A protein has these predicted regions:
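Conserved beta-hairpin
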Residues: 25, 80-114
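Short loop/beta submotifs within extracellular cysteine-rich repeat domains
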Residues: 32-34, 101-104, 110-111, 144-148, ...
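Phosphoinositide-dependent membrane-docking surfaces
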Residues: 101-102, 113-129
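Generic recognition of long tandem-repeat/solenoid scaffolds
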Residues: 21-28, 103, 136-140
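A membrane-cytosol interface segment of integral membrane proteins
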Residues: 130-183
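Cytosolic juxtamembrane N-terminal segments of multi-pass membrane proteins
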Residues: 2-31
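Alpha-helical transmembrane spans
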Residues: 26-92, 181-183
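Short, low-complexity cationic-aromatic patches
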Residues: 14-16, 31-42, 69, 125-138, ...
Length: 183
């Protein structure tokens, strides 16, 4: 086993459970950015609520003509509110259990839940997402297809930790993959 795999430390505030042939990592989404996003979300939605109450008062205000233009802003406001709730309540769990690699975001739904037979994975690797400072854990299946397993990891060391520990649990020998983040 390469020395690199032995040197990867678990990220702070992650709950790790390792048993022979299995692995589980869980972490909460909350970070300080949530505290800055809440006032913005309240301000955004407050303006929309103020507009809605002004527009609906007997439909006498000329702003009622702008009501249709507010619909996209309402969707953004609802999305921001839901995202704030997810930041406070959600956690992500990655586990190997009963021959399956399971990625689950809960308790509130979020895209990216996965359940993949672990025997289909030939290689795991980390990719830096273009246009942002986040990382993805990807897998190469036995039939040569690339599959994104987890997105939105905020630092390279967390992504590397998952790659290394899952490869160890799956008895996968680490190999270079075209397009992966250099070590």
């Amino acid at each position: 086993m390469p020395a690199r795999q032995l040197a990867v430390a678990a990220p702070e505030k992650w709950h790790i459970d390792t048993k022979p042939g299995s692995f589980s990592a869980r972490w909460r989404w909350f970070n300080l950015s949530a505290l800055f996003l809440i006032p913005f979300t309240l301000f955004w939605n407050g303006i929309l609520i103020g507009m809605a109450t002004g527009v609906t008062e007997g439909f006498t205000h000329p702003e009622r003509l702008l009501f249709g233009l507010a619909v996209p802003h309402v969707w953004v406001g609802l999305g921001l509110a839901y995202y704030c709730l997810c930041l406070f309540l959600n956690s992500t769990k990655v586990e190997l259990k009963e021959g399956m690699l399971i990625v689950q975001h809960s308790p509130l739904w979020w895209r990216g839940n996965r359940k993949i037979p672990s025997g289909e994975l030939q290689q795991l690797f980390v990719v830096e997402k273009r246009g942002s400072v986040s990382y993805e854990l990807c897998g190469l299946t036995r039939d040569g297809k690339r599959q994104t397993l987890l997105t939105g990891l905020s630092d390279e060391s967390s992504a590397r930790f998952l790659e290394v520990r899952l490869e160890q649990a799956l008895n996968i020998t680490d190999q270079a993959v075209a397009g992966e983040l250099r070590r």
